[in-house]
Each structure stands twice: as C-alpha cells, then as structure tokens.
Amino acid sequence: MSITDGSRVGIASPHIFPDGTVDMAQVGRFVRRAEELGYASLWTQERVTGRPTLLDPLTFMSYIAGLTSKARIGVSVFVLTRHNPVHLAKQLASIDQMSGGRLIVGVGLGANADDLLIYGLDPQRRVRRFVEHVEIMKALWTQTPVRYSGDFYELDNINIDPKPVQSPHPPLWFGANADAAIRRAVRMADGWTGAGSSPRDTFTARVKQVHDMLAEEGRDPKDFPISKRVYLAVDDDEKRALRRLKEWCAYYYGNADLPERVAVWGSAAKVQEQLAEWSEVGVDEFILNPVFDMEEHLEKLAELTGLS
C-alpha cells in the first residue's frame, strides 16, 4: 500500500540535536538525499528558548535552499507575534527568491502566551497582533507602496523589494487548534497544519471542522491543503522504538507519554499501514518526523511510502 496516491510526503530535516552537537554535515547529506528520493518538502520549526538544541528556522531554510533545487522548504510553525512583520516579510521574501519560489510559511500563535513577555509584548493582545502581522506581511509582498494603520503598527508609503517569487506570495499555512483559530485560518490562510502533538481523533474532528468552515466561507478545499506532522519510528523491535520516541518527547516536550497518543512506530509494514490510515483521514501533505537515526529513516520512509 502506498500513501503517496492521496498525500504528498515531506520530511523534517535534522535541525534538533538532542546530544547538543550541531552536525551540519548530516544536514547536507540528508537534504540532498531527500531531494534525490523524491520527498516533496523539507521542514524545520521554531523554538527560541528552552532545553532543545535547535537551529533558527530562517537561517536554516536559507542554508538548505542553497543545497537543493526541487523540494519545497517549510517551517511549521513560526510563532508569528515574536517577530516584527516588516522585517520577517523581507526575510521570507528573500528566502523565497533564494529558493526559486519553494517556500511554505507555517505560522501560529504558540502554545504559551506568556512567552511573549520575553519579547516585551503584551500576551493579552496576541490575537489582534497576529492578525496585523498577517495583514502587513501580505500587503508588503503584494503592494508598493503599503499604507497600513492598525493598533500596533503604522506604515506610511513602505515597500520591500524584492517581492517573493511566488504569486501572490508564499503560501501561509496556519497552525491552529481552537475553534476561533481554525476559523481565522480558513478566512486568512492558504492551508492548515495539524501539530505533531495532536492525536488522530482530535485531528480527524478538526479536519471535518476545517472542511465545514471552508464550505461556509465559499472556499474550495482543493485550494486549501491540510498537513500533519507525524512523529514516527521504524523498528521491528516495537518496545525499543517506543522507548526512543518517549525519550525524545521527554526531551522536546517534557512529556514522555505523548508518543502513545500521537506517534507511529513498529515494523515498516505497520508504519505503512498507519500512515495510510492518516492519509485517509484527510492529510494532503505529511511532515514525517523521525527523531533518531535520521538518515536511516530517510531511506526506510521513502521505500514504505512508495517514493523509491
């Protein structure tokens, strides 16, 4: 059974280094080989503070853009309100140019509102700030000059150049879980992405909700891709696979119990079967996320998903 019949297959690039040692040689080997194998997209994510040793996504995407030529390059997700929207719009337009129009921009509010205090921002107004960021970035990517008056930003005859390669702009995929956030995604975004920490039953319900809201807004679901990050481990020794997933989730999330609710593990046949089930739920693009033995998983996952 191949999951590629109904879903595109992307993969998380090595950008988290639990042993504390950043291995750029591995990154280079991985992304080049991923493109050779036919993966549709290469992904990173954002976390600024905390325990994980994790590379900055803007810098990382710029780097792998120069190592690849076909695979799309995505982040899932930026906590958008941490960033200045003018500066971020310029950086992302530059990466879209550098990659030849291959950028996907995942954005979200973030799970911890109080995190914004680090940046001198009021967490109580983060939703309004998020909306302004999206509006400003879209305007800067598509208009010259831009005039904008909001609660937080005033732009008077501002422009950025170069504009992105993609027209009208790089796709914005919102990470969203709450009802209001999903409604906002359907109205403002170009796609929706389910978190790696989202169990299948929750994700399934959210997919239905997205489709219902798209119908209400008069939008075609064919033009609104749904993606899902899936943590996984291919190993005939299921106990060992689960143990290693638990160790990684304890490191990254502080929650060793998470894999039993959200991850896929076991033999190649079992992982293939479970990914096919995820595909049937409504995943248009997988962000497959192995958490150890990255290069070995790159090959195994290409085979079991039908890429090679």
Predicted feature residues:
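Conserved, mostly hydrophobic/aromatic
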Residues: 34, 38, 64, 95, ...
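N-terminal beta1-alpha1-beta2 module of alpha/beta enzyme domains
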Residues: 1-67, 168-170, 291
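Flexible, glycine-rich active-site loops centered on histidine and acidic residues
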Residues: 2-23, 81-148, 152, 195, ...
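Short, acidic/polar
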Residues: 21-34, 87, 91, 174-184, ...
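Hydrophobic faces of well-ordered beta-strands that scaffold small-molecule active sites
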Residues: 9-13, 42-44, 73-76, 103-107, ...
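Active-site mouth loops of central-metabolism enzymes
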Residues: 11-25, 78-86, 166-177, 232-233, ...
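Acidic (Asp/Glu)-rich catalytic clusters
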Residues: 2-3, 32-36, 61-70, 92-103, ...
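Alpha-helix-loop-beta-strand connector modules within alpha/beta enzyme cores
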Residues: 55-75, 131-136, 140, 302-308
